[in-house]
């Protein structure tokens, strides 16, 4: 059952009426540009065809009644006329409450809704299931109540909910691509200006995401450490963010900078440059150049930023050996596990998945999950 079918069925069963409308918001995979977003840099994600769906029913009061179809129909009920606080014990509720709270604070006129939520974005895999949920809820209120809110504002509102209400640091990339993606395109995003450029994906290119199923135990604490190291490096160079440096300036001014902070900065500055080059290579269908840039990005994440783990590096090796030079593969997401993303010719997908299924468990004692994706449209009404 798809998420849209599921929310429709659960809505009819639980509220004893049909929903007034449905909305969706996709997950995403970042093709290149890792840990660059909070450094005011560049990223190149695409939305994927895994998504969060919301079935919506209008109410004539100020209550928001939410049912989480994926959590045994757990419920949350809160009143728009009362201060919106945290839920006592349902973490999923806080993503929704945060989105609604900040929509209110931005001055949008809200009223009560019945909502049923379901999604198939793999959780904990670095494919932005949380951003997909935040954007889907923002989209639900926009479509149901006719709010004059832009897709960029829905994204910023979702990011604020995650940073300030849920308490997880994140850049703007995940919400922005979920809100504003376009089918068969990647999105080059300038995380400082929020300017975007749609990059057409070659029609003969498959997007393969492979989840290592490595438990990402360190990711939150290490993410915050990397962020602090990047900020320390920016202070050393006297710039607002690492976005403002190129490799020559980085090298010229490194005297007195802690060696670890220098290597962290070298990855970020390099990945900004690689991301801009990758957008051009993708637009030109130059899979050889794209593969080189993805390989360089992965090596920098492994050696300079130190966010990969042996199983991830092994997955990249297994896949790269099958892809050859026509396409690329790298870890994607925050690090310490999660997924790798590969861009390759469609006729190689089956061979790559077979190699992963045979070699990865033998080397690392883990089974990987593979998802063949298509670059998909951003959030909207179904």
Swiss-Prot record:
Pathway the protein takes part in: Carbohydrate metabolism; galactose metabolism
Chief localisation class: cytoplasm
Keyword check for Nucleotide-binding: yes
Keyword ATP-binding: yes
Location in the cell: Cytoplasm
Active site (UniProt): 174
Range of residues in the leader sequence: none
GO cellular component: cytosol
Catalytic reaction equation(s): alpha-D-galactose + ATP = alpha-D-galactose 1-phosphate + ADP + H(+)
Superkingdom to which the source organism belongs: Bacteria
UniProt: ATP binding residues: 124-130
Xref: Pfam families: GalKase_gal_bdg, GHMP_kinases_C, GHMP_kinases_N
Binding residue positions for Mg(2+): 130, 162
Transition state stabilizer, annotated site positions: 28
SUPFAM superfamilies per record: GHMP Kinase, C-terminal domain (SSF55060), Ribosomal protein S5 domain 2-like (SSF54211)
Swiss-Prot/TrEMBL GO biological process terms: galactose metabolic process
EC number from the UniProt entry: 2.7.1.6
Binding site for substrate: 34-37, 223
GO molecular function, one term: magnesium ion binding
Family, similarity comment: Belongs to the GHMP kinase family. GalK subfamily.
Annotated function: Catalyzes the transfer of the gamma-phosphate of ATP to D-galactose to form alpha-D-galactose-1-phosphate (Gal-1-P).
Xref: HAMAP family: Galactokinase
Name of the protein in its database record: Galactokinase
Species per Swiss-Prot/TrEMBL record: Aeromonas hydrophila subsp. hydrophila (strain ATCC 7966 / DSM 30187 / BCRC 13018 / CCUG 14551 / JCM 1027 / KCTC 2358 / NCIMB 9240 / NCTC 8049)
């Amino acid at each position: 059952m798809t998420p849209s079918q599921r929310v429709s069925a659960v809505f009819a069963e639980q509220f004893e009426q049909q929903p007034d409308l449905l909305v969706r918001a996709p997950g995403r995979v970042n093709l290149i540009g890792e840990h660059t977003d909070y450094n005011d840099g560049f990223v190149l994600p695409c939305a994927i065809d895994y998504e969060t769906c919301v079935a919506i029913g209008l109410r004539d009061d100020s209550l928001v009644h939410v049912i989480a179809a994926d959590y045994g129909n757990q419920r949350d009920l809160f009143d728009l006329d009362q201060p919106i606080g945290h839920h006592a014990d349902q973490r999923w509720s806080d993503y929704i409450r945060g989105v609604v709270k900040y929509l209110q604070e931005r001055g949008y006129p809200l009223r009560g809704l019945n909502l049923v939520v379901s999604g198939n974005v793999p959780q904990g895999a670095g494919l932005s299931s949380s951003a997909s949920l935040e954007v889907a809820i923002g989209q639900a209120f926009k479509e149901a109540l006719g709010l004059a809110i832009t897709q960029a504002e829905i994204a910023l509102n979702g990011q604020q909910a995650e940073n300030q209400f849920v308490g997880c640091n994140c850049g703007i990339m995940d919400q922005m691509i979920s809100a504003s993606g376009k089918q068969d395109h990647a999105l080059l995003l300038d995380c400082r200006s929020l300017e975007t450029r749609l990059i057409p994906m070659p029609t003969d290119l498959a997007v393969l995401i492979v989840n290592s199923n490595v438990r990402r135990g360190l990711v939150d604490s290490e993410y915050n450490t990397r962020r602090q190291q990047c900020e320390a490096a920016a202070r050393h160079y006297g710039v607002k963010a690492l976005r403002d440096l190129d490799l020559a300036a980085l090298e010229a001014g490194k005297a007195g900078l802690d060696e670890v902070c220098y290597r962290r900065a070298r990855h970020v500055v390099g990945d900004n440059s690689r991301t801009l080059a990758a957008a051009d290579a993708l637009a030109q269908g130059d899979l050889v150049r794209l593969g080189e840039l993805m390989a360089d990005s992965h090596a920098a994440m492994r050696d300079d930023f130190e966010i990969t783990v042996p199983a991830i590096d092994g997955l990249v090796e297994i896949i790269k050996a099958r892809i050859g030079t026509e396409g690329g593969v790298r870890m994607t997401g925050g690090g310490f596990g999660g997924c790798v993303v590969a861009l390759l010719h469609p006729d190689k997908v089956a061979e790559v998945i077979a190699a992963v299924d045979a070699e990865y468990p033998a080397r690392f004692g883990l089974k990987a999950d593979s998802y063949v994706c298509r670059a998909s449209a951003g959030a909207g009404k179904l």
